[in-house]
Amino acid sequence: MSETVIRTDDGTFAMINVFEVEPDRQKELADVMSEGADRFIRHRQGCISVNILTSLDGKRLVYYAQWRSKADIKATMGDPNVQYYRDKAAELAKPDPHAYTVFSVHHPEN
C-alpha cells in the first residue's frame, strides 16, 4: 500500500486543489471528492496517494494527491470518469488546482 511521504528527492509531483466552499456544503464536497478518489483516482497509473483535508471553519477543502509524474496527472485529468467528479465538485465549490514539486521539508530535532 502506498502512503503519503513528502520528500524533496523522490521526483514525485503533487496535485493540490484548494476549494472555497460554503460551510453547509463542505461535507457534501468531501463526500464527492472521496468517492471519486476511491472509485477512480487511486486506481490510476502513477497515483501514490490521495488526501482530503477539511478546514475547521468549514470554508475550505484541500485535495492533495501525489503522483509519480506530470504525465500521470495529465492522463488522469483526461479520464471522463475523473472529469465527472471534477465537474461535480466545481458545482459545489470554487476550485483552485495546481501541480507542485516539494521545495523543502523540515522536521523537529529529537
PLM region spans:
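Short acidic, gly/pro-rich beta-turn/loop elements at beta-sheet edges
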Residues: 27-29, 60-62, 73-75, 109
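Short, well-ordered amphipathic alpha-helices
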Residues: 34-38
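Short beta-strand-to-loop capping motifs
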Residues: 18-23, 65-67
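Short alpha-helical
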Residues: 24, 58, 68-71
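Glycine-rich beta-strand-turn "strand-cap" elements at beta-sheet edges
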Residues: 1-13, 20, 51-61, 85-110
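Short amphipathic alpha-helical segments, especially helix-boundary/capping motifs
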Residues: 11-15, 26, 46-47, 61-63
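Short, surface-exposed ligand-recognition loops at beta-strand->loop->(often short) alpha-helix junctions
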Residues: 20-33
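An amphipathic, aromatic/His-enriched active-site/gating alpha helix that lines ligand/cofactor pockets
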Residues: 39-48, 66-101
